[in-house]
Amino acid sequence: AKAKRSPRKKKAAVKKSSKSKAKKPKSPKKKKAAKKPAKKAAKKK
């Protein structure tokens, strides 16, 4: 029973980690995208 339970917990942990990793990279990308246009606008001015 323990052997059957552990793989399920590992799968759940993998799903949680994948979701957290997927969410974390998106926010920095949004921040970078917001910063880049501001820098370009400043250079044009």
Swiss-Prot record:
Q: What is the effect of changing residue 39 to R?
A: In component III
Q: Where are the transmembrane segments?
A: none
Kindly list the biological process annotations in GO that this record carries: cell differentiation; spermatogenesis
Sample GO molecular function, one term: DNA binding
GO CC field: nucleosome; nucleus
Effect of substituting residue 12 to T? In component II
Q: What keywords does the record list, in alphabetical order?
A: Chromosome, Developmental protein, Differentiation, DNA-binding, Nucleosome core, Nucleus, Spermatogenesis
Q: What does this protein do?
A: Involved in nuclear basic protein transition: histones are replaced by spermatid specific proteins which are themselves replaced by protamines in late spermatids.
Q: What is the effect of changing residue 6 to T?
A: Possible variant of component I
Q: Where in the cell is it found?
A: Nucleus; Chromosome
**Protein name, as recorded:** Sperm-specific protein Phi-3
